[in-house]
Regions:
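Binding-site signature for planar aromatic cofactors or substrates
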Residues: 1-274
Length: 274
């Protein structure tokens, strides 16, 4: 069953997105056609047909959105309700009403070290209704994913560092999956049940969201963002088949240095002359 989408944001969703204590995920397209997922807690509704988010660090997504303006998004509230949708980037600004509103938020108002220095504006394409996370099913799915991981475990390339494997294996860490459907739209799903299966794979059961996961074609380019309550995060990208992601790239999405850690973008040569 495909999710139902709407062309405007209802009042309940606007109120939820206006809250600062939420998790926001933005999906842009990278240079290889993979979804690139970023933690964007500042995303909120400007009105019924537009969204905004603020920038306070120079991550890759803010550059990618200029080349590929069509994006996906998912927002998860503190009371475990979520929505998702798609939008198109239109412009950005470093002055104006929204700029002042963002920087007057309690977290940033008296913060002289870090503030929003650019606001991004997006036109809404579609948005889902607010839905509760099925916590009971997630617990069952997490157990089944860990059993599955025992049978598909692979650690030949050493793609995902040990700290990333530990982050994925935490039962309370959040995970979000994204792929592009047949029409080229980014589809985001919460996949809290996912876990690491060695350093080279991520395993997830079909509970919950089994029908939605079955819509992902074998061999599709898929990305999964994992983060915990300490805001530690890692992004993996790879090819998906039957509930297993074969990791091709690993991106450190935490400041201060956000970069690919597998394969490494730079080589370190040993010092031989003293």
């Amino acid at each position: 069953m495909k999710p139902s989408y709407f062309s405007t944001i209802d009042s309940a969703s606007i109120k939820m997105m206006d809250c600062d204590s939420k998790v926001g995920v933005l999906a842009t397209e990278d240079e290889r056609g993979y979804p690139h997922l970023s933690f964007i807690s500042s995303i909120q509704a400007l009105n019924e047909q537009a969204l905004t988010f603020g920038q306070f660090s120079a991550g890759l997504s803010k550059r990618l959105i200029l080349d590929h303006p069509r994006v996906g998004f998912l927002v998860l509230s503190a009371d475990k309700r979520y929505l998702s949708g798609n939008a198109t980037y239109t412009h950005s600004a470093n002055t104006g009403k929204e700029f002042d509103l963002y920087n007057n938020k309690p977290l940033f108002r008296y913060n002289s070290y870090m503030g929003f220095y650019r606001i991004f504006y997006l036109n809404l394409e579609r948005i889902s209704a607010l839905k509760p996370l099925p916590m009971g099913a997630i617990i069952v799915g997490a157990i089944l994913s860990r059993v599955k991981a025992l049978f598909v475990k692979k650690s030949e390339k050493g793609a995902l560092p040990f700290v990333g494997q530990s982050l994925f294996s935490q039962l309370d860490s959040l995970k979000f999956l994204c792929y592009y459907d047949a029409s080229g739209e980014a589809v985001l799903l919460p996949v809290v049940q996912a876990t690491s299966a060695g350093s080279d794979r991520i395993a997830l059961s079909g509970i919950p969201f089994g029908r939605a996961l079955k819509q992902i074609p074998d061999g599709a380019k898929v990305s999964i963002l994992c983060l915990n309550l300490k805001m530690e995060s890692v992004l993996v990208k790879g090819l998906y088949s039957d509930g297993v992601l074969e990791i091709e790239r690993v991106y450190n999405s935490m400041p201060p240095k956000m970069e690919y850690v597998y394969p490494r973008s730079e080589t370190i040569s040993p010092v031989r002359d003293f």
